[in-house]
Amino acid sequence: MAAPWISKVKASGKLAVFVSDAVKRGAWANAFTQAFAEFNRLAAGGKFGVTLTLASSPPDPDGLGGADVNFDVGDGRTTFKAMGQEFSVNVLGSQMHGHTQVVGFGDGNGKVTEVIKSFVFVPAAPTINSGPAGNQIVRPVGDAIRTFIAVHEFIHCAGLSNSDHSPGNVPDVFLGQPQPVSGAKPQDDKMLLFLGNPNIFAPPITVSSRTTGVIQGLWPQQP
């Protein structure tokens, strides 16, 4: 279930994102830049009530300071510290989706009721099968799929959980299980969101009124 951010962050209408060196200097650099801009474009058009900014320092491991969101790559068991506690997540480095771990106040039953910090891990080297049947190779995915993955995780950062994923009949970037489709070249790779007549692919990246409504319910509209 979706959860709002703490009041200080919610009132600002901004999420400050710290980007790791592994992202800035690696294969995710271009996709991160594109996804950052794409989320803000969608946020402006849909009046989400929240936009992304860049932070110069990571989240304080022992308190409320630093960035709100940490964006990093993951491959295997990855650990981090927040609010004085150690956390770990397991990210398969070749998979086609990321993982967003929120840290926040809870209800005592494992449910987060207010988000304090958010940690995004995208797969270090997502791969796709490409080529004609019987002669396929496994290669890195193109930036379009990486960008899709990152925008999806940014929506999680806004406060949405897996239970808020878009259903199959409302295909958008927050779909739970989009299907990767390889192109003749990595730059032609895309995500299949809906198999029908016609098929619906991303790019372009879109957000439905359903997803927009959930986000708006968590963030006060800025003047």
Language-model segments: which ranges?
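Disordered inhibitory propeptide/activation segment of secreted metzincin zinc metalloprotease zymogens
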Residues: 1-27, 36, 41, 92-111, ...
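Hydrophobic beta-strand segments of well-ordered beta-sheets in folded domains
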Residues: 11-18, 68-70, 118, 189-191
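Residues at or immediately flanking beta-strands
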Residues: 14, 47-51, 192
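Bulky hydrophobic/aromatic "packing anchor" residues in well-ordered structure
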Residues: 17, 39, 120-122, 171, ...
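Second-shell loop/turn segments in exported
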Residues: 17-28, 129-141, 199-205
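Metzincin-family zinc-dependent endopeptidase catalytic domain
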Residues: 29-180
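Short helix/strand-capping connector loops at secondary-structure junctions
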Residues: 184-201
